[in-house]
Amino acid sequence: MFNKHSVEIDWGGRPLKLETGKIARQADGAVVATYGETVVLATVVAAKTPREGVDFLPLTVDYQEKTYAAGRIPGGYFKREGRPSEKETLVSRLIDRPVRPLFADGWRNETQVIVTVLSHDMENDPDVLAMVAASAALTLSGAPFRGPIGAARVGFMNDEYVLNPTLDEMVDTQLELVVAGTADAVLMVESEAKELSEDIMLGAVMFGHRHFQPVINAIIELAEKAAKEPREVSQADDSALEKEMLGLIEGELRPAYAIADKQQRQNAVAAAKAKVIAHYFPEGQEPKYDKLRIAAVFKHLEAKIVRWNILDTGKRIDGRDAKTVRNILAEVGVLPRAHGSALFTRGETQAMVVTTLGTGEDEQYIDALSGTYKETFLLHYNFPPYSVGETGRLGSTKRREIGHGKLAWRAIHPVLPPHHEFPYTIRVVSEITESNGSSSMASVCGASLSLMDAGVPLKRPTAGIAMGLILEGSRYAVLSDILGDEDHLGDMDFKVAGTEVGISSLQMDIKIAGITEEIMKVALAQAREGRIHILGEMAKALTNARAELGEYAPRIETFKIPTDKIREVIGTGGKVIREIVEKTGAKINIEDDGTVKVASNDGEAMKAAIKWIKSIASDPEVGQIYEGTVVKVMEFGAFVNFFGAKDGLVHISQLAANRVQKSSDIVKEGDKVKVKLLGFDDRGKTRLSMKAVDQQTGEDLEAAGHKAEKADAPREAAGE
């Protein structure tokens, strides 16, 4: 019934199995990949005919996690998986980025890759396995895919690289790096690091590249057994058309790409394009060429002019050389009511970054496949259409915004203080107000400044820079701080963020078949020079975190109470803690280990809440003086609330120094009194005294009397 084929290898000390022919047989390509006990299914379907009216590769990649894979039922009312989580979106991008450059030029057929997590063993993260499975399914599908690719996760512990560390091992690693590529070159890198050197980062990339070679060989072996015949892609020869078009507009297009200002340059390019349209599509005549073909040739000419100009002259579009960073202006404290804010401008790229400090109530609850946890650091990136001078629809967050936000998050996360030292929930929002390349790295710089402006004690300021590449044969140029056009027309987007000590995040995307170790080494060294320069410019605005939190930020005090007292502080159905919150206005969070966090903008309210909680969580001491409130007056005395929720009896004989006929002659309900704890009777009832305390000063009269007696004793002995 089934025409099954499989390949199994040992990879990083665990078995990796790739199987096809049993599940999803109607897809063009389908592979079930198993690593340990983590299992994913990758499917590929490509449309039979090209999509009309498009000049790009219509590729869609969807990664989805099913909760049954971890033996769980989804939360919520409907009890089924909903819209993609952040993790699913990020892994979808992780798969897309290395496979997209490997499709044949001119492939315009709708192509969909779906990867589904079927089982998760809580040891092996499914993301790398999903990349491997997608690569295998594409290789089998018959789509014009010039793969396969391999992928690996690399950790760094005890000065050694670790291949595919488990989820438990990732807790202790100094590096989390995912690398993907072909047998010959690296195509994609995504990483977070604890301020590691360029050499260690490059070593990790090459370590991963070496160790995913067996995976590529396994996919090739499976393809030899089960792959479909590759589909043909028709590609017209446009060399003559390109030569003709260059003669028509070279005089306009070449000077256009020497204009430094983005909008003026775009206007000049648009004028050249209009000339092309007018020439090839004259009114009233049947056009000789398709509009998409003309547009593709025009784009190719743009790239050719920009690329060869850089290689031949060393000068870029805006007149800079390869290593120069655009002019930078960094400002902090730009928003009066925000807890922290910064405006970071680099050339025509600008980010308004705002920090807000919150309490435990503001933590984000993450329901991940590997388990639930609370996130205390959030970084959100917004890219409105006005930032590039366009109109557009505002709606749900796009994949690109999620990806750029996570990249900036990875850059900042390693330099944040530990949560037990700075117990705030931190939210950073980067609003891109202008964009001409490298907006995610502007977000990193702005986030660092904004956090320091808010008083968050970062280990060190952090900056980011985007590097580009022009590669023609054996000639290449690595570009620092790339423009948007250099990104679109170049071969690489290589983003590096870090401190003066080392790298905290690295992301690389290649649009060609891959780059060599030599080019990466040059790019990392050049990126360090640029990063140090940017840090120097940022230091003109702020060098360290402010000594005090922002005026409008909440203050948080942290202390511990015995775990057996948590129930008393919370009260039945939360009655006690609700009363504390209502009466003091403070926010209170109590952890299972007895850690209490009290937050408030009002110092007095915070003190009152802390005093109240401590009074409940601790026991009163015999002989100590307390201030209390009379809650009930009886014939035999008065009950006084004196220690949190604790009440005690002041017997009528202890109300005053002189004889008291009626308790109500001395006190009434609601009176504020000072009492001394005398002790506890046989039944555990609390005994208090008012007469032992000076009600005006709070002085212990019994102790004062004892001191006076001791002072009089020598005089009596002398017979005075």
UniProtKB/Swiss-Prot annotation:
Instruction: Give the chief site where it resides.
Output: cytoplasm
Q: Which GO terms describe its molecular function?
A: 3'-5'-RNA exonuclease activity; magnesium ion binding; polyribonucleotide nucleotidyltransferase activity; RNA binding
Q: Where is this region: Disordered?
A: 691-720
Which reaction is the catalytic activity of this chain? RNA(n+1) + phosphate = RNA(n) + a ribonucleoside 5'-diphosphate
InterPro entries with a match to the protein in the record: ExoRNase_PH_dom1, ExoRNase_PH_dom2, ExoRNase_PH_dom2_sf, KH_dom, KH_dom_type_1, KH_dom_type_1_sf, NA-bd_OB-fold, PNPase
Q: Give the EC number.
A: 2.7.7.8
- UniProt keyword annotation of Transferase present: yes
The protein's location, in the record's own words, is: Cytoplasm
Q: Which residues form the KH domain?
A: 554-613
Q: Which Gene3D superfamilies match?
A: GHMP Kinase, N-terminal domain, K Homology domain, type 1, Nucleic acid-binding proteins
Q: Which GO terms describe its cellular component?
A: cytosol
GO-annotated biological processes: mRNA catabolic process; RNA processing
Nucleotide-binding in keyword set: no
Binding positions for Mg(2+) per the UniProt entry: D487, D493
Q: Which family does it belong to?
A: Belongs to the polyribonucleotide nucleotidyltransferase family.
Instruction: List the NCBIfam families hit by this protein, alphabetically.
Output: polynuc_phos, PRK11824.1
Any idea what this protein is called? Polyribonucleotide nucleotidyltransferase
**Organism annotation:** Nitrobacter hamburgensis (strain DSM 10229 / NCIMB 13809 / X14)
